[in-house]
Amino acid sequence: MKDLTRRKWFVWLTAYWFLFPVAGFLLLAAGVFFGYGERSYIAVHDNMDLFLAQFQMLKNTNSFLAHGVEIPFLGGISRDNLPSEMSLYTVLYMFFPTYTAYVLGILGKILLGMFSFRLLAGELFADKYVIYRPVIYMTGFVYGIVWFFPAFGFAFASIPLCVYFLIKIYRDGGKRWYLALFVYPMVSYFSYHGLFLLGYLVIAIVWLSVRDRKPVWRLMAALVVLAAGYVGCEYRLFGQMLLGGEETIRSSIVNADLSFAQILQEIGTVWKDGIFHADGVHAKVVLPVCVIYFLLLNGRYLYQRQWKKIFHDPFNFVMAFLLFNSVVYGLYDCGPLRRLVEALVPPLEGWQFNRTIFFNPFLWYGALFLVLIRLYDRGIWTMWLANGIVCAAALAVILTPNRYNDLYFTCYNRAYEHFHGTEVDELDYEQFYAPALFEEIREAIGYQGEWSAAYGLHPAVLEYNGIATLDGYLGFYSQQYKEDFRRIIAPALERVEQTRIYYDDWGARAYLYSGTDLSIVQATKTVYATDYDIYIDVDAFRELGGTYIFSRLELTNAAEAGLVQVDSFTARDGSCTVYVYRAAAK
């Protein structure tokens, strides 16, 4: 080993080996997503069925910068209910085609997470940055490649950047750091992270003021600057929340009221596994490493009777923070507490204060980083053990097929096609939206902007292709419209109690539901339905202005339901057939 340490190539490799996995992954991801293009397999849930269609509608209607206009879904939704143009992620969709913007968002999120982590770690451990550099970049890289909720990937990845700005303000107080903090919300999102960052900052201000025995004016100013930044970047959201005056579906959302035992179980589950919107894939490598280290560290403190170190060790602080966020997540399902919060702050009615859990992936990888640098401090062999651990964590993220791992599913499904000579049943991006098919449909039926609805497919497919929809998916729209739309689907809701509860107690998905099957909306080539009848009130459909229904099912009771079949259309590759129906005249 002594001979190796004298060789320049080994010294260089020890310092810069991380460049190979980082560059290799970025090239692989870019090659796969741009190589397969729109034939890639992209996550549907809360992604292609929601935000990608919203961005495409803004593009179709040239409404990114518009004010006082309605977007043609859910009977007409204010532009202010959709993502702000002051978001860097939204800007991508303003200048690039939707699929290209989505891929650039994935790659940008990785770089943002990695360099944000590098800035923060470099600030906290400046004296040993050169030594720790490989695990700084690798831990940041792993955090960056975690497959978060895509529309808010920048917001997740940039958390360390916000912490970095706040530390610089606390230590230096330079004007440039206040300016940086003011524009930081362009890569964040108030409802998911912003309000909590402000809350955590208030706690930090109180704690530091007590510890330092004087007010921390710099952070107090930072609190005002950050809040102003969020208001400026998300002025549309604040306008709707505070000045809208219209009752929204948030007022009718029914949340679970769990027992004490169920709350404890939920706390343990999210601590261990997280949630699908913020799945840090930490349970496979990061959690075991951190738990083992936690036991060894504090076992040693107890054995040596160093009680104070237990409470002053940064690693223990991070682990306690993780537990705190998990406890808050569980307490959200404590009905009396949740209703108290809503009573004290009415604008937050229906708002999920359990989103503290969204910070846990950053904390898990922060805790892992503390373990790794302490291994670095112990010598050459433990240094390479640390390198092995962080590489294992990276492989766990890359190879775990969680909900938003588009790279895994694209590679797997294309490999399956290559070796088996047939495509999988799932629809890829192009097949899901089927733009060529819907262009043919619009021309054939002479579509002129008539209000329509989808049956057996996501309304997002119609929205993406320039078809105005009475149905749709949005977590914040008029309660009155929810009730009006309910009249259309009442016959189906009366037949399936689970569907009735799903709509009445939530209602974000205003869909045409089956009167028999729990779900007939799948992103698959095969239509999985047992009942080809449709159960709707066609008079209510007409009263809301409805004309067309685009269905993946060939309806067996169209005439009885008050519908007339116009025609059927099949994609050139046979992946999808759409049956077009028109509401019969009275």
Language model features with spans:
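Membrane-interface coil-to-helix junctions
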Residues: 21-113, 152-153, 484
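Hydrophobic, aromatic-rich transmembrane alpha-helices
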Residues: 285-323
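Signature aromatic-anchored transmembrane alpha helix within multi-pass, membrane-resident enzymes
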Residues: 372-407
